[in-house]
């Protein structure tokens, strides 16, 4: 298992209330929670040695008679790599799968070809795995009829309700309890002493809510999520569920209860329906709004999809974001979902809640990006483009928005070759703030992906995370149907990352200008499915030993010049004093003071020499204390943050610009625009858009300062 794979571990949802009569279980989904899934797994705990011997014996007998793929039930149709259960098998899943293989091999060797075909259609690997999913997908199938008041994992429902209805002091905060390896998680909402469900600042609303609460006796409601996460992932999965789903859904229900008495009315409706329908829970769910909310929430969250809930006539959506965005390559032992996107630009947007950055190490910590105010996601996203993950009309239909709404028009106008800033300029009716809101909305709800605008002048490579071993077989035929006039998928990927030469601009792959749009569409398809990522350029400013020596010599010469100037000024002062003494009338004075002053004047040059030594020593200390990276024995130095360069570092930079490279005023202006980005963290491809610099100007600058930069190209 890995934190990159979705695993909500949700096995049920309970609705518990507390009235003057005590706690009561109102509704639960699935209806039958009496069985313990861990007990069902025990029957598959066979002896490993016996199973291996049987497996090897039967395989040696049948391998020459029957096709191996058919014997194992593995082919391109039933090996559904797109299904989430494909990546979440457990030991019990594997044992069950091996049992299915045994029975399949026996039937293949004993049945006729017609019966064999029927057997293969009946037993599919996808069905086998999906029925034993760790995400409790068995619970999402049509459950048997059962009483809501029945046992919950072998424990009396009334006993569990007593524990799930905490006293008022423990309500309105996170609630977590473990019973028989099952974790009960929720946010119990209790009515305050003044009859309010939440603090209200206006007296009118206060009086209105008092009339609501006077009509019912509901004191507390608690929506409890029952989970069985893996032990090693327990804390992470529980926090994830509470943050994204439980806390938000409970607060929405509290709001509706405060404003419209929603929960109280639904509880009365459910109790009345339970009496009239005589245990027909499926019909109860269809007639109760809150029951449908609980059912839809379970079916959406347990399958790692988006739960679209209609709460009191308002559409609310909840999800646990999946991790398909990576800023660096994960370890080989860390699994991830196919079609994941690998790009350093994810790091710039990782400080928002809209992108859930993937883990690069097993059971590591979530990536936390620290960005300054200038590079915040709110400001920098306007320079990015959106890549829709589905057809525009399908997205509009799935989001249940009107076809002529502003959001629908925005979705239709999205082009992966245009940044959001250009979209705003192209449509005067949409301001940039509204476009950013729409963009974040599409990103969060898995309808679009943030990328740098596609360009034929950019360089693209095959992603190290490309799903070549998982989806390539199916995607080859799909790519050929989608782009019949283009090279095949393997050949297309070979053109992007050839073995004989370095990757070049995408324009070298396009045969002519007439093919440009079609090739860019194919490029967008490859990025969407995780096959391709953009190769970006990052640079550091390098200070050679030669530059440092010259700057140090300049500093020493300046100090010597200052010393000579002081000596000259001192001699002039002494001469002036002597002339004034000869012209002055002779007065009876004490010669002691004169001797002291003469001795001070004679000793002043020596004092200047001693004074210059601490300054030179301080210079060396400043050089040693500069935040730099030494490459080879202190010869060359990389400035880590040229945007906040020290005084000495600025002198190094000026020496490069004006004396070593002798840049023109135009290139000097471009250099200072890019100086703060020469830290190896910002790609030049993004800066071209951000600073409005042409590629020709950038190319001239890089050629001029080529000896003084270190360039690295990666995703």
Curated annotation (Swiss-Prot):
What ranges does the record list as Low complexity composition bias?
Answer: 126-148
InterPro entries attached to this UniProt entry: HTH_NPRL3, Npr3
Q: Map out region (Disordered) in residue numbers.
A: 104-149, 562-621
Q: What does this protein do?
A: Mediates inactivation of the TORC1 complex in response to amino acid starvation. Required for meiotic nuclear division.
Keyword Transcription annotated: no
Q: What are the record's GO terms for cellular component?
A: GATOR1 complex
Q: Which family does it belong to?
A: Belongs to the NPR3 family.
Would you tell me the protein name for this molecule? Nitrogen permease regulator 3
> Which gene is annotated as encoding this protein in its UniProt record?
NPR3
| Alphabetically ordered keywords of this record | Meiosis, Signal
Q: Which PANTHER family match?
A: CGTHBA PROTEIN -14 GENE PROTEIN, GATOR COMPLEX PROTEIN NPRL3
Q: Cite the record's Basic and acidic residues compositional bias ranges.
A: 114-124, 610-621
Which residue positions does the secretion signal occupy?
Answer: 1-21
Q: Which GO annotations describe the biological process of this protein?
A: cellular response to amino acid starvation; meiotic cell cycle; negative regulation of TORC1 signaling; positive regulation of autophagy
């Amino acid at each position: 298992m890995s934190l990159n794979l979705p695993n909500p571990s949700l096995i049920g949802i309970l609705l518990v209330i507390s009235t003057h009569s005590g706690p009561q279980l109102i509704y639960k989904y699935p209806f039958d929670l009496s069985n313990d899934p861990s007990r069902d797994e025990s029957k598959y705990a066979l002896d490993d040695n016996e199973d291996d011997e049987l497996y090897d014996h039967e395989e040696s007998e049948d391998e020459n008679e029957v096709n191996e793929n058919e014997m194992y039930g593995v082919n391109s149709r039933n090996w559904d790599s797109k299904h989430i259960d494909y990546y979440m098998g457990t030991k019990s899943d594997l044992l069950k799968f091996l049992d299915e293989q045994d029975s399949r091999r026996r039937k293949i060797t004993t049945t006729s070809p017609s019966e064999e075909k029927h057997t293969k259609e009946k037993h599919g690997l996808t069905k086998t795995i999906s029925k034993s999913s760790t995400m409790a997908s068995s619970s999402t199938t049509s459950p048997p009829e059962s009483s809501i008041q029945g046992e919950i994992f072998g424990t009396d429902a009334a006993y569990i309700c007593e524990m799930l209805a905490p006293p008022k002091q423990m309500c309105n905060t996170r609630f977590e309890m473990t019973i028989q390896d099952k974790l009960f998680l929720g946010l119990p909402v209790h009515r305050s002493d003044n009859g309010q469900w939440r603090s209200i600042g206006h007296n009118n609303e206060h009086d209105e809510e008092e009339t609501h609460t006077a009509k019912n006796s509901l004191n507390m409601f608690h929506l409890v999520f029952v989970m069985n996460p893996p032990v090693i992932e327990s804390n992470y999965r529980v926090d994830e569920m509470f943050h994204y789903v439980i806390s938000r859904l409970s607060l929405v229900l509290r709001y509706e209860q405060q404003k419209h008495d929603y929960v109280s009315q639904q509880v009365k409706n459910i109790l009345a329906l339970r009496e009239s329908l005589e245990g027909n829970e499926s019909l109860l769910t269809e007639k109760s709004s809150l029951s449908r909310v609980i059912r839809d929430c379970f079916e959406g969250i347990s399958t790692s999809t988006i739960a679209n809930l209609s709460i009191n006539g308002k559409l609310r959506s909840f999800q646990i974001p999946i991790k398909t965005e990576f800023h660096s390559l994960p370890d080989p032992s860390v699994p991830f979902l196919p079609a994941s996107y690998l790009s350093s630009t994810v790091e710039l947007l990782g400080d928002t809640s809209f992108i859930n950055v993937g883990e690069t190490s097993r059971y590591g910590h979530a990536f936390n990006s620290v960005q300054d105010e200038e590079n915040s996601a709110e400001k920098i996203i306007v320079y990015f483009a959106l890549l829709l993950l589905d057809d525009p009309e399908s997205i509009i239909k799935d989001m249940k928005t009107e076809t002529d709404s502003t959001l629908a028009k925005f979705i239709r106008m999205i082009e992966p070759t245009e940044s959001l800033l250009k979209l705003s300029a192209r449509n005067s009716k949409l301001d940039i703030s509204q476009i950013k809101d729409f963009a974040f909305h599409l990103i969060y709800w898995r309808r679009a992906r943030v990328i740098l605008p596609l360009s034929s002048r950019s360089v693209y490579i095959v992603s190290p995370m490309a799903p070549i071993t998982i989806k390539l077989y199916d995607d080859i035929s799909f790519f050929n149907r989608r782009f019949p006039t283009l090279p095949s998928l393997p050949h297309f990927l070979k053109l992007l990352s050839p073995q004989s030469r370095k990757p070049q601009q995408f324009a070298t792959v396009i045969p002519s200008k007439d093919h440009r749009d079609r090739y860019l569409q194919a490029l967008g398809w490859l990025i969407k499915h995780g096959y391709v990522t953009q190769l970006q350029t990052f640079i550091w400013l390098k200070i050679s030993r030669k530059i440092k020596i010259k700057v140090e010599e300049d500093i020493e010469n300046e100090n010597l010049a200052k010393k000579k100037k002081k000596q000259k000024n001192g001699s002039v002062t002494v001469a002036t004093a002597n002339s004034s003494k000869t012209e002055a009338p002779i007065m009876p004075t004490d010669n002691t003071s004169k001797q002291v002053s003469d001795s001070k004047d004679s000793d002043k040059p020596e004092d200047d020499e001693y004074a210059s030594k601490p300054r030179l020593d301080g210079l060396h200390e400043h050089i040693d204390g500069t935040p730099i990276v030494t490459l080879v024995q202190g010869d060359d130095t990389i400035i880590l943050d040229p945007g906040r360069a020290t005084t000495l570092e600025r002198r190094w930079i000026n020496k490069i610009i004006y004396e070593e490279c002798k840049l023109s005023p135009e290139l000097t202006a471009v250099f200072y625009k890019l100086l703060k980005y020469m830290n190896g963290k910002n790609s030049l491809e993004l800066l071209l858009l951000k600073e409005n610099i042409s590629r020709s100007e950038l190319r001239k600058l890089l050629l001029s300062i080529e000896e003084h930069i270190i360039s690295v190209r990666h995703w």
